[in-house]
Amino acid sequence: MVDIHSTAIIEDGAIIEDGVKIGPYCIVGKDVVIKKGTVLQSHVVVEGITEIGENNTIYSFVSIGKDNQDLKYKGEPTKTIIGNNNSIREFVTIHRGTDDRWETRIGNGNLIMAYVHVAHDVIIGDDCIFSNNVTLAGHVVIDSHAIIGGLTPIHQFTRIGSYSMIGGASAVSQDVCPFVLAAGNTVVLRGLNIVGLRRRGFSDEEISNLKKAYRILFRQGLQLKDALEELEKDFSEDKNVKYLVDFIKSSDRGIAR
């Protein structure tokens, strides 16, 4: 059973699955799919080619799937894809992709607090937290389990690694490595995110290896190339250190230090 308020506008062609609740004055466009258990509170607008997964809660005055703000965008049939079990709070804006990636994508279990902006072609993993007024510019990639403090803008094409935590009112213009704490304008590294790693169930051995890797990368004065070679040699069997090394090697914007 679908629960749709009498004042909501659902255009012909929209696919609304059982268990969806759509509140007062919502607008759902003709190319939208909303899967079971998702709740749209009041005044939510969902347009464009948009798919919203199961059991999401979308609060008042959220806008999803509208045309992006890229001046090169000419109305291409790009998409917005949202997974399951996300909480999207008041006044969040999530724009559709461009012909670069063809989609903006959000994973599962994320908390996106009020007034966050998710621009075109952004990719967000799972179980991330975005505090109020975070701004993700176009093409930003946020790996799973990251936490971004409030009022933080992130430059286009920047990547944020898993299990990292960025302090509030920071400004991010380079990639932020996984597993670290970072803060400042512009952002600098403040150490390993040890409390966060413990809360996520990392073992003492895993944390110890990441501490050693952090020291080799950022505290011993080595050239980055030499530090990476040392990590590959000494931690070849450690999946977390391998992810860290691969992250740095794949960086296009350079890494924050």
From Swiss-Prot:
GO BP annotation list: lipid A biosynthetic process
UniProt keyword annotation of Transferase present: yes
Reaction(s) catalysed (UniProt annotation): a (3R)-hydroxyacyl-[ACP] + UDP-N-acetyl-alpha-D-glucosamine = a UDP-3-O-[(3R)-3-hydroxyacyl]-N-acetyl-alpha-D-glucosamine + holo-[ACP]
EC number: 2.3.1.129
Protein name: Acyl-[acyl-carrier-protein]--UDP-N-acetylglucosamine O-acyltransferase
GO cellular component terms, semicolon-separated: cytoplasm; membrane
Pathway: Glycolipid biosynthesis; lipid IV(A) biosynthesis; lipid IV(A) from (3R)-3-hydroxytetradecanoyl-[acyl-carrier-protein] and UDP-N-acetyl-alpha-D-glucosamine: step 1/6
